């Protein structure tokens, strides 16, 4: 339905798939028991200086998750498409300098995104436009 101003929502152009760890068997061969681990830490109350233990569950180092992002290009508007792909590429680059989830200042949630490329899944797209999209993804 429409919002309070009478505007109708548009469908999202980006669809992010769920990511399931793809290398758990490889990690198990290297001694990892499970895809997550529990780390024991302490927080210290700033006024009373009393330590309080806590447990943080995190994904094990070296875990790999395949990422699929679907961009819905309803009309072939080259300028808009390239701007959107550049924005996505920049966002993924910035994410690699930041973290996902909590406790990033402790080094948790760091990600590396590599081997990213664009391909046409349904319909047709001009090869030159697709090549430009891949250039943008590789550059950022």
What role is predicted for each listed range?
Residues 1-140:
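Small/polar/charged residue-enriched interaction surfaces, especially the RNA/DNA-contacting tracks
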